[in-house]
Design a protein with these regions (language model features):
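Rhodanese-like catalytic fold shared by cysteine-dependent sulfurtransferases
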Residues: 1-24, 32-68, 77-116
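Short, surface-exposed ligand- or partner-binding patches at beta-edge/loop junctions that are enriched
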Residues: 72
Length: 116
C-alpha cells in the first residue's frame, strides 16, 4: 500500500482517459463556486474539501472497491492533502493527484476551460 498520493500530469491523465484502460474515478475537491468557473470536462465525483469527513467520503465511494482514483483541485495542493488524508484513513489503497489541478488541465489539455 502506498503511503502518499502518486503524481499524474494533465498529459498522462488525458492519455489514460483516452486509452482502453478502465477510466479512474475522478474526484474534484474544489468548492461549488470554483466548479461554476471551471468544471472538469469528464464525469467526476464532487467532494468539496470543506465538507469532507471519513463518513461522508465512505458513503460516496463505498461501491468503488478496486477502482483507481485521481483527485484534483485548482492547483494540486488541496487534492494532494485530500489524497494523503484518504490514504491515512484507509479510505483508498492508491490515489493519484493531478499535478497543477484544473489549472494545468486548462493550460495543457483544454484551453476552453477558464483559468482563475
Amino acid at each position: 500500500m502506498s503511503n502518499c498520493p502518486k503524481s499524474i500530469t494533465a498529459f498522462e491523465l488525458n492519455e489514460w482517459l483516452n486509452s482502453e484502460i478502465e477510466d479512474p474515478i475522478i474526484i474534484d475537491v474544489r468548492e461549488y463556486s470554483e466548479l461554476e468557473i471551471a468544471s472538469f470536462p469528464k464525469d467526476f465525483l464532487h467532494l468539496p474539501i470543506s465538507k469532507v469527513s471519513v463518513d461522508f467520503v465512505k458513503t460516496k465511494i463505498s461501491d468503488s472497491k478496486g477502482k483507481k482514483f485521481v483527485v484534483l483541485c485548482h492547483a494540486g495542493i488541496r487534492s494532494y492533502n485530500f489524497g494523503q488524508w484518504s490514504l491515512d484513513n484507509r479510505l483508498v489503497s492508491e490515489i493519484w493527484n493531478l499535478e497543477e489541478g484544473i489549472d494545468g488541465w486548462s493550460k495543457y489539455i483544454d484551453q476552453k476551460i477558464p483559468r482563475y
